Regions:
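Alpha-helical substrate-recognition element adjacent to the catalytic core
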Residues: 11, 16-101
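A ubiquitous, low-specificity "background" feature that marks scattered single residues
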Residues: 3, 8, 37, 42, ...
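Non-catalytic pre-domain segments flanking phosphatase-related domains
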Residues: 1-28, 176-186
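Intrinsically disordered, low-complexity regions enriched in Ser/Pro/Gly/Gln/His and often acidic
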Residues: 1-4, 55, 170
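Mg2+-dependent phosphoryl-transfer enzymes with acidic/Ser/Thr/Gly-rich catalytic loops
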Residues: 45-49, 86-87, 91-93, 100-186
Length: 186
């Protein structure tokens, strides 16, 4: 039995360090990226999700370094709104069944080009954004069809530190990681 692997584009072969240093906007899907993709539906009809604290802390580090963060999600939930507010993410677009128009609108609002963005996704509806962003990322447990278009596939699964992995790498390539770590070495 043979296993066909999707063509992988590695960080350093897909983009130079200089290209990665141009990334200013980190755009995230929610279900399957910031969460493990599971949704708990309570008897009163409300939903809850589990978010990674590790991802949340790295998002705050990204913002502290001057980076912008946005969310583009296919679903609209109160849990996403609340978590985005907790993390200081004001660029939140929910209920986007077609994500590419939301991506283009977001770029107009912030005055950036696709090359200045990184997008992290996990499923089929993320393919257009992974292809369009300057740096397209698929989480470890993403759909195989998405992985074939990604510049990088994380080692960690969605909701389990995948976003933290991406942020750490970007900050290291932007030469900002060590500076941010100084506050923890006191």
């Amino acid at each position: 039995m043979y296993r066909i692997l999707w063509p992988l584009k590695l960080w350093d072969s897909a983009m130079t360090d200089n290209d990665l240093s141009k990334i200013q906007l980190l755009i995230l899907d929610v279900d399957g990226v910031l969460t493990d993709g599971g949704i708990v539906v309570h008897s009163d009809g409300t939903e809850s999700k589990r978010f990674s604290v590790l991802d949340g802390h790295r998002i705050k580090l990204w913002q502290r370094s001057g980076g912008l963060t946005a969310v583009i999600s296919g679903r609209e939930t109160a849990a996403t709104t609340i978590r985005a507010k907790q993390l200081g993410i004001s660029l939140v677009m929910q209920g986007c069944l077609e994500k590419l128009p939301a991506f283009e609108q977001l770029l107009k609002e912030v005055g950036l080009t696709p090359e200045q963005t990184a997008y992290v996704g996990d499923d089929l509806m993320d393919i257009p954004l992974v292809r369009r962003a300057g740096f397209g990322v698929a989480v470890a447990n993403a759909a195989d069809e998405l992985k074939q278009y990604a510049d990088f596939i994380t080692e960690r699964k969605g909701g389990e530190g995948a976003v933290a992995e991406v942020v750490e790498h970007l900050l290291k390539k932007k030469m900002k990681w060590e500076e941010l770590m100084e506050r923890y070495r006191v």
